[in-house]
Amino acid sequence: MIMRMTLTLFVLVVMTAASASGDALTEAKRIPYCGQTGAECYSWCKEQHLIRCCDFVKYVGMNPPADKCR
């Protein structure tokens, strides 16, 4: 019984985390001021207090700024 409750809680946490990151990506694609360049999109990402902005910029199809990302 405890194992089932633990598993259920784990699944809920994972689904919530996946949903939150997906919402951020959807939001950036929907909002036109993410930027015209990778540097602008990176700055927008940082202003939103998102993490992994280098990966985010790549995901939306832009090149992240070389001085900020490796």
Curated annotation (Swiss-Prot):
GO molecular function: toxin activity
Organs and tissues of expression: Expressed by the venom duct.
Propeptide span(s): 23-28
Keyword entries, A-Z: Cleavage on pair of basic residues, Disulfide bond, Neurotoxin, Secreted, Signal, Toxin
Keyword Signal: yes
Localization: Secreted
Keyword Lyase part of the UniProt annotation: no
Cystine pairings recorded for this chain: 34-41, 45-53, 54-69
Domain comment (free text): The cysteine framework is XXIII (C-C-C-CC-C).
Domain of life the protein comes from: Eukaryota
Major subcellular location class: secreted
General function of this protein: Neurotoxin that induces excitatory symptoms in mice following intracranial administration. No symptoms are observed after intraperitoneal and intravenous (tail vein) injections.
Similarity section: Belongs to the conotoxin K superfamily.
Signal peptide: 1-22
UniProt name for this protein: Conotoxin Im23.3
GO cellular component: extracellular region
Organism: Conus imperialis
